[in-house]
Each structure stands twice: as C-alpha cells, then as structure tokens.
Amino acid sequence: MLGDRKRKTGHTVLLITLLILSELFAGCGSQEKAGMSELLPTVREENRLVLYTSHKPEVYQPIVEEFENQTGIYVEIRDGGTTELMEDIQNFGKGTVDVMFGGGAESYNAYQHCFDRYESSASAKLNLPIAEEGGVWTPFSELPLVFIYNSRLVEENAAPKGWKQLLGDEKWKGQLAFADPGSSGTSVTILAAIPQILGEDPKICIPAFASQLDGKLCGGSADVVDSVENGTFRVGITLEETAKKRIAQGAPLAVIYPEDGTCIVPDATSIVSGAPHAANAGMFIDFTVSIPVQRLLQDQMYRRSVRRDLNAASPAEMKIVPFDYGWTAQHQDELMQIWADTQKAEREAADAVE
C-alpha cells in the first residue's frame, strides 16, 4: 500500500554513505541528494526527476517512494523552506530542477516567471475554484488557517474567538506564537490573509498584528506549534493539518476556527521552466492528485483533498473567506515592506527605551 513500502532511494543513499561517509555527513542529507546525479551513472537520464520540496519528510517520502516504485523513475530530492527554494529556483534552477513540490499557491504566483503552466490529467476532478486560479500551479491539498491554544493554560471560553479579538485584546499581547515571514511561507500567507479576512487596509491591520507579537517571533512554522505546546506562548496561528497532527500525538492543544472567517489556501506543485525532465515532472504532478495519494492525505496526513470526488465536509463552525490570489501576488512586496517597516520601528523604539 501507498506509504507502507520502504524507500528504495534510501538504499542508494546508504550505498553512497558507505562510499563517501565523511562528505555525506558533512552535508545536509536530503539537501545534498539533488547534487548526487554524477554519482549514479547507472540511472539513465530519462529515468530521473529533480525535485525541490518544502514538505516535511513524513509527507514527501511515502509519495515519492511510491512514485518511484510505480514508474521506475529515480527522484533526486532537495528539501528546505519555501522561500529559500523559490529563490534558489529563480537564481539557479532553470535547466537543473524539474519540480517544486510544496509551499502555498500564493508563493507560486509571486514566482510565476520561474514555472511553466501544466494541466494535470486529473484537472476535471479538482475543485474548480482552486484549479481555475491555478495558472502555473496544480493544487496538492487544502490548508485552512486556524488558531491553536494550550488547553492546560487557556480555558475554552477564554480563548480568542476571532481575528479582531486576537489583534485587539491586550491579554494576548506577547502571548501569540507567529513565525518569522522571512523563513516561513505559512506566515507570508497569514500576513496576506489578515487584510482580506478583516477587510482592512494592510497599513492598519498588519502593524496592529505586529504590535500584539510584542517583538517575539518563532524561527519557523514548526516552532509555532512547539512553543504553544510547551507553554512559551498561549496561542498561535498555524495550518489545520499541523495542529491536528500534533493533537493526534497527544499535545495539549485545541483548534479554533475564527468566527470572523478564515482562508483555505492550497499548497501546490509546479514544473520549473526549462525542466530537463519535463515529461517525468508532469507524471509526478498527475500522481500527486491521483485518488490513492489524495486518500493518503485525508486518511493519514490530516489534510484536505483537492479532488471533488474525495472532499470531506468542513466543520460547521468554519466560515470561509475566499483567498484572492491576484490581490496577494500584486501586493505581496507591499505587505512584506509594511512588515519590515513595522519591525524596524519596533526595534528602534525598544532601543530608545534602553
């Protein structure tokens, strides 16, 4: 079954490890894999795929290994943060990278000049409001933004019910976990979603949001859940699948669907312009939206399928605000500049007090 087989590429990596042990451990594991093609002369060029992914191994490994098993295509992987990988594709990816797998759809729109349009063989089965927005990307899963809180530290009736309360109530000042947008694609999505959900000028609501953080930022998206779980912060903003996964592992967390609405933003997959193995890249994208993979997302990964024939019902308390990809792409630089200016002003104010 999908996800149950051992990763055959792991055997190749193990062989390489035995041959060049010190060099491999000096590197970055899967990040080095994308540069190992010269060490694998037995793999024919037409049977390769170079994959960049911002997914965690528990997401990409079962999918990649089953793709390899079914197609005989060897997948070379480099993983990392969405922004880091997008920048690398922009600067060095043409002619060397085939696929970007993972990261919010709005990131693909911001870097759309780096990708080629591809219509999946399953496009007729995908949620049309998402697929029609696609442009250069194909959706992989639907990811609602949610609040989380530490259920040992915050009573249910005291938890923030919506964005206006989270941004306006002084009791959450300095108690809100949020990752640095410079390293977290999820945080970039959140910054873009807040003005759309509240219907406010970004120059007003983003500084108000930043003020609630009180100068405290988490290093990455995973740190948001960690810091709420361990009590460093009492509440946080994250993706539904991230929260549900941790709760299933026994974390003292609870999920809130904001009463004033939330956005469901898909993560995506796309073919890099100039992909050296473009046909294999198309096969991989088709595989990610196939019924077996999409069922795997729902059954084992706490994610929502993008297929109409597999969609699970949303919670009754979830009020969905459409995410405007065009507006986000047009204003992303402005949003990040507002954020940077706000952070600079807060640092200067803190220095003045000292």
Describe the function of each predicted region:
Residues 125-128, 143, 174-182, 206-210, 217-218, 287-310, ...:
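Periplasmic-binding protein-like
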Residues 50-61, 80-86, 90, 94-232:
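Extracytoplasmic ligand-binding site segments that recognize negatively charged/polar headgroups
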Residues 146-153, 195, 265-280, 296-297:
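A bilobed periplasmic-binding-protein/Venus flytrap-type ligand-binding module shared by bacterial periplasmic
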Residues 36-41, 49-74, 147:
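Short, polar/charged alpha-helical segment
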Residues 202, 305-354:
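An extracytoplasmic/periplasmic, membrane-proximal ligand-sensing/linker region
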Residues 106-111, 229-252:
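A ligand-binding cleft/hinge motif common to bilobed small-molecule-binding domains
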Residues 1-48, 348-354:
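Short, low-complexity disordered leader/linker segments with a strong preference
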